[in-house]
Amino acid sequence: MGNVAQIPDNRRYILSQRTIAFDVTPDLITENFLATVLRTPTVFASLTALSSGGTAKGVSQKSLATVDIAIPANMNEQEQLASIFSGIDHLITLHQRKYDKLFNLKKAMLEKMFPQNGSLYPEIRFKGFTDAWEQRKLGDIVERVVRKNTNNESSLPLTISAQYGLVDQITYFNNRVASRDVSNYYLVLNGEFAYNKSTSDGFPFGAVKRLDLYEKGVLSTLYIVFSIRNQSKTDSDFLTVFFDTDRWHKGVAERAAEGARNHGLLNISADDFFDIDIFLPSHREE
């Protein structure tokens, strides 16, 4: 419900009329502690309950003034608490920058270590590998999994997060989206893959992820589940990395029904998905 920002200096700034500006009562609370406490889940829940409006909900200045907060009477304790969380925020920022750098490095390496623009040779290769990559159909190396959870072998509902992979639905959404009866869902085993046809920011053609975190789980039949036909010929980790690239996007774009998107869900059949091209090196290079 909105956000809280603390002015970092004594310069003057211009704010929109939808922004509430306020100062502290210095003998009751420190600026840093107030900035910290206003970002807590408890205060967020209070503000959410007081919010009004349609799509863009907001909290009035009058409502904001009624929010109760708990504060230590000792000003030194307030400063120490604020200092701890400020330090944590700083560490989060540093790690986020490292993550961003590594993410960009991975993206650049994926671009250069997989063939592109019809070539059978990637721009960067490991020493000792010079052979052309082989063009195959995805369906040549994987097979569809349509195993149902008929005997209720698993009660763990999964969802596909483009960022985190196949994860527990309850943990991810903080809620159970799947129906209580999951006997008609697909039963997915560790090491198998699933294609989520839903588009999202950064994933315009959905996402393909492998089940790594759990031994088994269940997925809605809206997803396309598949496994590798021959593990001795196709490396599972290679396929995982391949689907982190955009090399398969063109194949999906060519086969998805033109303009057919139902609330962000691509209209592509399993047969068409398995018909997309994939380029493979030797098993050793994979």
Give residue ranges: language-model regions.
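Amphipathic alpha-helical segments with low aromatic content
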Residues: 67, 73-134, 282-285
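DNA target-recognition patches
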Residues: 14, 22, 142, 147-179, ...
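Intrinsic, low-complexity N-terminal interaction/targeting segments
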Residues: 44-61, 66-70, 257-262, 267-270
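Periplasmic-binding protein-like
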Residues: 44-46, 248-253
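A short beta-sheet element
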Residues: 1-39, 53, 183-190, 194-248, ...
